[in-house]
């Protein structure tokens, strides 16, 4: 691609720098750059097919972000010990990049395009997701691919009341706002993040702060593109791929019919779809009779554009929506808990034609999710999985496991709920939430938030506050600035509209949000209006949820694992575990419990999980017996563990053995101890002495027996 290396630098506060370099790596790609901040380096490449597939009427764009384990000096886990398919974390970053760049390709560009972003060097303090969007955009800018960028994405966090761009990993842990913001020099395109119940004005301030950093990064990309000066590929002009005469005929013939149908306010989406489809079918039949060569591909496209225009005009001119609602009206809500009697927690949440059946399952520390990534190793005690079967929209599709959409929706709902979970010290359980979407007509991820909140309270998890979510939409005339903000959008409004803005939070504030914008001109004032309207909708939904349950249940379900905790001296941990774990494994096997032993702040913390309280209490008793301190002079029932010529070793307390000397077995002289005691025999013994140096125990049996000499006397 290039014969020389070109590099540009972006300056950040606190003497930090980002460099963008091209001309050294992957020169056969249509565009490639290396973005570096500290020791974190990303290689981004773009390639495209110049041959156009005439059957494709969309942009076949593929964005893949992958972390190389070697970047962090690690070898991947698993049997193959190599990178495989993208993990959830990589999918989420791929989606962040895709959502920001996809709107900026020209309408007439429909060539297959692939963007790969590799993490090739990893500084654990500098997070690569903050640089992935910048890398992808820079690679596009220096490539022949027509791209109406540049864009960039930055991470903005509020730490101790101050906003920081691309904070370090350690600093991020103290943030109360954590946002990824993507945009161009003029517009914000994408927002996603989590926060600690903050106010709407705080979100707007964070976005505006991020946009200033984005503008600078876009300017540097322009300088890089000017220095490379790649000749851009020209896609086929729209005039050569469009039939404007057919479009005009379709609009003139059908606009009034479609508008009248839309204004009926049909609430059932299948009936509404059928009504629009009938209009389309009848007119297409008429067109084909007049001209059998009429392009059905073009007609389908123009009819879709007609529907889109009608929806916009209906909302902008009359303040009405497809299902008859007003702009800020929320669909009818129904919810119930304890729907599944055998689950640890469950809820059924229905809003209009969107329905989520959600379960909560409580597990032990052994059920924690293993996280094995290039930059992060550890365990997660909170999981949320979102499932979207095809029948939820009345379609036939093969179930091939969770796709990118399911992973993204589940992650957003998880972020919304995790902010209200009790601290680890207050919650002993690993928590898994599963949301199965049974019906879908818009905002199923926010239905998952609502259902998840209800199910957690049903399960007895002491969340700080209930959480609700709402999806907002926007219809906007970019020429006049006239707009309509929609609350609780339908699936059609999402597809036909200009914005999808999901907001989740408590009565106190916002805990998560996600926004995708398709138009320019979204001013701070308009964003503020959308957030305030979203707040009113969220509070309304919370009110409906409170009719079902207002506080978490005070007890766990009978099917949930029973739990208790115990503190023991640090020096007794080994006694409870036993040689090679023998004692604790035996306890778990015989009581049917799971026992977790940890050292915390110089103490032993033992957690017991069992199928019922009786099992837990049984395990507790056995541990108490092990850690109990023997008392000199007390009598115990001991088991003969071994017999030696000079006596026997007797276990008089769990894990504690003492010597019963041959002279302490009987008052009479014993020649052969095997004739008096048997292995496994249970005998009463008295603790005579604990050696102050060795801690060894001295036992006696004879002192509990009558003394023949005393009897004779």
Swiss-Prot record:
Its cofactor is Mg(2+). Mg(2+) binds at residues 494, 500. Keywords: Cytoplasm, Magnesium, Metal-binding, Nucleotidyltransferase, RNA-binding, Transferase. PANTHER family: POLYRIBONUCLEOTIDE NUCLEOTIDYLTRANSFERASE, POLYRIBONUCLEOTIDE NUCLEOTIDYLTRANSFERASE 1, MITOCHONDRIAL. This is Polyribonucleotide nucleotidyltransferase. Its main location: cytoplasm. It catalyses: RNA(n+1) + phosphate = RNA(n) + a ribonucleoside 5'-diphosphate. Residues 633-702 form the S1 motif domain. Its EC number is 2.7.7.8. NCBIfam families: polynuc_phos, PRK11824.1. It is found in: Cytoplasm. One of its GO terms (biological process) is RNA processing. Belongs to the polyribonucleotide nucleotidyltransferase family. The keyword Methyltransferase does not apply. It comes from the Bacteria. It is an enzyme of class 2 (transferase). Residues 561-623 form the KH domain. GO terms for cellular component: cytosol. One of its GO terms (molecular function) is 3'-5'-RNA exonuclease activity. Involved in mRNA degradation. Catalyzes the phosphorolysis of single-stranded polyribonucleotides processively in the 3'- to 5'-direction. The keyword Cytoplasm applies.
């Amino acid at each position: 691609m290039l014969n020389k290396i070109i590099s540009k630098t972006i300056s950040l506060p606190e003497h930090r720098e980002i460099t963008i370099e091209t001309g050294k790596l992957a020169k056969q790609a249509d565009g490639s750059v290396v973005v570096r901040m500290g020791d974190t380096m990303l290689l981004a490449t773009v390639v495209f097919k110049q041959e156009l597939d005439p059957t494709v009427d969309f942009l076949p764009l593929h964005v893949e972000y992958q972390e190389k384990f070697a970047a962090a000096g690690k070898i991947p886990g698993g049997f193959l010990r190599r990178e495989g398919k993208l993990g959830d974390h990589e999918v989420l970053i791929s989606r962040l990049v895709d959502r920001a760049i996809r709107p900026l390709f020209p309408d007439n560009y429909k060539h297959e395009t692939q963007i790969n972003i590799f993490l090739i060097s990893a500084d654990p303090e500098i997070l690569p997701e903050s640089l992935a969007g910048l890398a992808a955009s820079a690679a596009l800018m220096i490539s022949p691919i027509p791209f109406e960028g540049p864009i960039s994405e930055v991470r903005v966090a509020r730490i101790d009341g101050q906003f920081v761009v691309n904070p370090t990993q350690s600093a991020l842990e103290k943030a109360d706002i954590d946002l990824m913001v993507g945009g161009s020099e003029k517009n914000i395109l994408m927002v996603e993040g989590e926060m600690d119940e903050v106010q709407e004005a705080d979100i707007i301030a964070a976005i505006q702060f991020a946009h200033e950093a984005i503008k600078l990064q876009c300017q540097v990309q322009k300088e890089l593109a000017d220095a490379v000066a790649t000749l851009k590929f020209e896609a086929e002009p729209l005039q050569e791929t469009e039939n404007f005469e057919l479009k005009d005929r379709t609009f003139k013939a059908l606009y009034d019919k479609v508008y009248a149908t839309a204004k009926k306010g049909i609430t059932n989406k299948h009936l509404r779809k059928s009504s629009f489809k009938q209009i389309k079918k009848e007119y297409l039949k008429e067109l084909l009779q007049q001209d059998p060569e009429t392009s059905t591909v073009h007609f389908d496209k123009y009819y879709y554009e007609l529907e889109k225009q009608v929806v916009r005009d209906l909302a902008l001119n009359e303040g009405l929506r497809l299902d008859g609602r007003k702009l800020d009206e929320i669909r009818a809500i129904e919810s119930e808990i304890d729907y599944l009697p055998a689950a640890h927690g469950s809820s059924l949440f229905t809003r209009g034609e969107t329905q989520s059946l959600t379960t909560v399952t409580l597990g032990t520390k052994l059920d924690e999710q293993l996280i094995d990534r290039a930059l992060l190793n550890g365990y997660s005690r909170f999981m949320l999985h979102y499932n979207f079967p095809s029948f939820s929209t009345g379609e036939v599709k093969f179930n091939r496991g969770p796709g990118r959409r399911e992973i993204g929706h589940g992650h957003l709902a998880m972020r919304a709920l995790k902010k209200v979970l009790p601290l680890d010290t207050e919650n002993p359980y690993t928590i898994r939430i599963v949301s199965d979407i049974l019906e879908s007509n818009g905002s199923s991820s926010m239905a998952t938030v609502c259902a998840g909140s209800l199910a957690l309270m049903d399960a007895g998890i002491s969340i700080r506050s209930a959480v609700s979510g709402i999806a907002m939409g926007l219809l906007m005339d970019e020429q006049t600035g006239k707009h309509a903000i929609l609350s609780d959008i339908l699936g059609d409004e999402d597809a036909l509209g200009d914005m999808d803005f999901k907001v989740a939070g408590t009565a106190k504030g916002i805990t998560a949000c996600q926004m995708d914008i398709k138009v320019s001109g979204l001013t701070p004032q308009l964003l503020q209006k959308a957030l305030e309207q979203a707040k009113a909708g969220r509070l309304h939904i919370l009110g409906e949820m409170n009719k079902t349950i207002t506080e978490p249940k005070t007890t766990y379900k009978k099917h949930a694992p029973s739990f208790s905790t115990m503190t023991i001296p640090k020096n007794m941990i080994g006694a409870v575990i036993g040689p090679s774990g023998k004692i604790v494994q035996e306890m778990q096997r015989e009581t049917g419990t799971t026992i977790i032993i940890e050292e915390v702040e110089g103490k032993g913390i033992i957690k017991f999980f069992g199928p019922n309280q009786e099992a837990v209490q049984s395990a507790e008793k056995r541990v108490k017996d092990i850690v109990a301190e023997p008392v000199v002079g007390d009598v115990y029932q001991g088991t003969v563990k071994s017999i030696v010529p000079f006596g026997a070793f007797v276990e008089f307390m769990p894990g504690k053995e003492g010597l019963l000397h041959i002279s302490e077995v009987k008052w009479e002289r014993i020649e052969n101890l095997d004739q008096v005691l048997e292995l496994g025999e249970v005998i009463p013994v008295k603790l005579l002495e604990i050696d102050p140096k060795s801690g060894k125990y001295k036992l006696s049996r004879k002192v509990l027996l009558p003394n023949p000499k005393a009897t004779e006397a």
